[in-house]
C-alpha cells in the first residue's frame, strides 16, 4: 500500500516542480522572415514552415514576418482579437500538420496588416493554444504593430522593423518594455523576436542611449541572417525572465527566402 501512495506523492511533487519552473527557455522558438508573396507563400507555408514545425525536433513557436496569407488548409476558429483602441485585429486558425485520422494541430495567430499586397503580414504559429493574445500599437505612423501570444506567464512577441536600417527598432523594444511595466503585466516574462533591420550591436547602442540595456538582453546569432550579409533577425528578452541567460540564438540552414530562420534554444547545462 505504501508504494502506490509514495508513487502518487512523487508524481504530484514532480508535476508541481515542472509547473513552477516553466519558463521561456523551456520552449523551442524560431523567427523567420518568409519574404511572403502570393502563390509562393502558400508553397513556403506547406513545405518550409511545415518542416520547421513538424516532428520531435520541430519548434514550439514560430514567429513569421512577411507572412503573406495563411495556408488555405488553415481553419478559422472564430476567435478574433482586436484590443480596444488599437484597431489591429488578429485571427486564430488551426492548422493540421498530420492526417485526418492522426491530427497534429498547430495554432496560427495572423495579423493582416498589409491589406493591399497582403505580403508583409505578421503571424505566430504555436504548438499550444494561446491563453492571451497581445497587440502593441505601432511606434510611428509608418511602423507595424508588435503582436504576441501568452502561454501561462510567458509571452512571445514578434515585430518587423522598417526597412532602410530599422529606424524604429529601438522604439519597438521601448514600447514593449513599457507595455510590460504596467502593474498588471509585471509578473510576465517576455521574449521579442523578429526582423529588426538593424544590427544587434547598433540596437544595443540605441538601448544604452535610452538607459534600457540593463532591462533586456539581445540574443543574436554570430552568422549573417540575410543573403546580402548582416545580422538582422534576432531576439530581445527581458532580463527578469527566469533562465534568460540560458537561451542562445542559432542560424538555421534552411533557405527559401532572403532571410535565414533563427532558432532560440536553451544551452546545455
Swiss-Prot record:
EC numbers for this chain: 3.1.-.-
CDD domains the record matches: CdtB (cd09081)
Record Gene3D superfamilies: Endonuclease/exonuclease/phosphatase
Keywords: Endonuclease, Hydrolase, Nuclease, Secreted, Signal, Toxin, Virulence
Signal peptide segment: 1-22
Residues that span the membrane, as ranges: none
CC terms in the record's Gene Ontology section: extracellular region
Compartment(s) where it occurs, according to its Swiss-Prot or TrEMBL record: Secreted
Predominant place of localization: secreted
Molecular function terms from GO: endonuclease activity; toxin activity
Up-regulation conditions: Expressed only on infection of host cells.
InterPro entries: CD_toxinB, Endo/exonu/phosph_ase_sf, Endo/exonuclease/phosphatase
Keyword ATP-binding: no
Additional detail: Unlike other pathogens possessing a CDT activity, S.typhi does not encode CdtA and CdtC (that form a heterodimeric subunit), which are required for the delivery of CdtB. It means that the CDT activity of S.typhi is strictly dependent on CdtB. Both CDT activity and expression of CdtB require S.typhi internalization into host cells. S.typhi is the only Salmonella serovar that encodes cdtB.
NCBIfam families recorded: PRK15251.1 (NF011787)
Function per UniProt: Produces a CDT (cytolethal distending toxin) activity, which causes DNA damage in intoxicated cells. This damage induces G2/M cell cycle arrest, chromatin fragmentation, cell distention and nucleus enlargement.
Name of the protein in question: Cytolethal distending toxin subunit B homolog
Organism this protein belongs to: Salmonella typhi
Amino acid at each position: 500500500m505504501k508504494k502506490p501512495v509514495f508513487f502518487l506523492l512523487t508524481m504530484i511533487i514532480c508535476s508541481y516542480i515542472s509547473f513552477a519552473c516553466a519558463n521561456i527557455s523551456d520552449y523551442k522558438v524560431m523567427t523567420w522572415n518568409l519574404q511572403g508573396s502570393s502563390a509562393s507563400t502558400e508553397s513556403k507555408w506547406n513545405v518550409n514552415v511545415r518542416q520547421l514545425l513538424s516532428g520531435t525536433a520541430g519548434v514550439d513557436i514560430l514567429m513569421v514576418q512577411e507572412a503573406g496569407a495563411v495556408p488555405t488548409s488553415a481553419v478559422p476558429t472564430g476567435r478574433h482579437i482586436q484590443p480596444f483602441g488599437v484597431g489591429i485585429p488578429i485571427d486564430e486558425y488551426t492548422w493540421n500538420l498530420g492526417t485526418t485520422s492522426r491530427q497534429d494541430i498547430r495554432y496560427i495567430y495572423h495579423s493582416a496588416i498589409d491589406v493591399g499586397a497582403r505580403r508583409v503580414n505578421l503571424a505566430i504559429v504555436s504548438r499550444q493554444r494561446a491563453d492571451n493574445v497581445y497587440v502593441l500599437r505601432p511606434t510611428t505612423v509608418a511602423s507595424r504593430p508588435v503582436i504576441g501570444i501568452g502561454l501561462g506567464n510567458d509571452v512571445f512577441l514578434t515585430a518587423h522593423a522598417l526597412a532602410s536600417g530599422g529606424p524604429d527598432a529601438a522604439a519597438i523594444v521601448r514600447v514593449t518594455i513599457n507595455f510590460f511595466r504596467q502593474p498588471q503585466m509585471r509578473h510576465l516574462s517576455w521574449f521579442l523576436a523578429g526582423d529588426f533591420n538593424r544590427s544587434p550591436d547598433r540596437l544595443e547602442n540605441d538601448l544604452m542611449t535610452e538607459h534600457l540595456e540593463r532591462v533586456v538582453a539581445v540574443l543574436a546569432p554570430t552568422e549573417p541572417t540575410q543573403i546580402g550579409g548582416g545580422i538582422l533577425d534576432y531576439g530581445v528578452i527581458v532580463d527578469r525572465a527566469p533562465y534568460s541567460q540560458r537561451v542562445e540564438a542559432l542560424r538555421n540552414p534552411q533557405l527559401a527566402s532572403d532571410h535565414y530562420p533563427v532558432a532560440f534554444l536553451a544551452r546545455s547545462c
